[in-house]
Amino acid sequence: MARVKRGVTAHAKHKKVLDQAAGFRGRRKNTIRTAKAAVDRSKQYAYRDRKNRKRSFRALWIQRINAAVREQGLTYGRFIDGLAKAGIEIDRKVLSDIAIHEPDAFGALVASAKKALEYLKNTETPNAFEGAVR
């Protein structure tokens, strides 16, 4: 059986790691041991931050919606509740976009949410336990 020398595969693996570490500062870009550690850590950060990006974008959309809704005399929570009661299912990304680029359409959404909240407020049945003697 022939002897297998690992030089070619080892060189390919090292080259792959060093290519991924291109742009790093100092010894981390050209020493295989530190480059491998830095690349591994950067992949962990990338994985974590892909999850965090979703959170931060949702928070941004909510802040934008809240600002636009407060200009029209409603809070974010009441607005979302009103949309749900009105049967309007639009996600926060689209709501944020509408609030920025089409204020008239957003005003119509706010009006329909207010109308749904007001309608349900007037038609609620009284609580059966109110006024009961204990």
Swiss-Prot record:
Protein role: Binds directly to 23S ribosomal RNA and is necessary for the in vitro assembly process of the 50S ribosomal subunit. It is not involved in the protein synthesizing functions of that subunit.
GO cellular component, one term: ribosome
Coiled-coil features, chain-numbered ranges: none
Signal sequence annotation: none
Record keyword Metal-binding present: no
Regions crossing the membrane: none
Alphabetical keyword list: Ribonucleoprotein, Ribosomal protein, RNA-binding, rRNA-binding
Top-level taxon of the source organism: Bacteria
Pfam families in the cross-refs: Ribosomal_L20
Organism of origin: Brucella anthropi (strain ATCC 49188 / DSM 6882 / CCUG 24695 / JCM 21032 / LMG 3331 / NBRC 15819 / NCTC 12168 / Alc 37)
Protein name per UniProt: Large ribosomal subunit protein bL20
Family assignment from sequence similarity: Belongs to the bacterial ribosomal protein bL20 family.
MF annotations from Gene Ontology: rRNA binding; structural constituent of ribosome
InterPro entries to which the protein is assigned, alphabetical: Ribosomal_bL20, RIBOSOMAL_L20_CS, Ribosomal_protein_bL20_C
GO biological process terms on file: ribosomal large subunit assembly; translation
Keyword Isomerase on entry: no
